[in-house]
């Protein structure tokens, strides 16, 4: 019996095709890969796929519903569509604090405009005025205001004082925003995590144009660099195991030698060869192909084949949120990405732009 691995994708081109080609090139007995094909979606009816890699359902609700049905009927969907639907960035920050992973000081802000079909009576539980001074004293200025959910670097604002915040908050409509401490950093990293075990730590410059963000090098050197990479590796695994993501990126801004998690809710992260570079692209294609094959071999159509994070697992078992079932492995010598060419652009200040 042949098991199919499907990839569901949108406008991206380089990663999906390379992924399918890589899986098929491995010529594993009983495993083939292709782009997902959907002709009709019947309730409680299985798909043709043992494994589906999801790269687009965050933008297409029809696909998200299709994937939930596929998962219910035994497909191993990467990433878990039920958790992805429930997850958002403010919760991620809250969970990170319970896990001992440093994050910027962050507060949640109500939307500027009321949600559709609500009135002022819908908000009688909010104090008026809210304790803005307490929030501002906690977070400080400058700060970043960005949506509490979603991504793609959309609707992210740097605010310098309360009046600047009010002015920019006017532009956010019905978006629920969060206000986050600005981190002025000496190093910045973006990290792939595949299968909650494979980690790729990449020097990253979020202030560069999109196609040059990986054109940078690690600034920390010597024993401090080794310690920093080991800590980042630990935090990446800790976060992804708690959240239950099998394909994700985590971003860290390093301030005074401490890696601070800026963004770690990216279940369909950028994997385009023209932005991440050839060597990083090769790594993520290989890691994703190996993960998909492994999951296809393990997949049992009569069971739930989704990955659930330790946050959910421990809740079901009535264990503490921070309970860890096994030790996190030490960082390997192959973890750091190769150094990229240096950018000649000068930088100043910090950023929490990732959203």
Question: Model-predicted segments: where are they?
Answer:
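A long amphipathic alpha-helix within ATP-dependent nucleotide-binding catalytic cores
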Residues: 211-260, 286-300, 304-327
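Phosphate-binding core of ATP-grasp and ATP-grasp-like enzymes
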Residues: 173-176, 182-218, 233-249, 253-260, ...
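Intrinsically disordered, polybasic Lys/Arg-rich low-complexity tracts
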Residues: 332-355
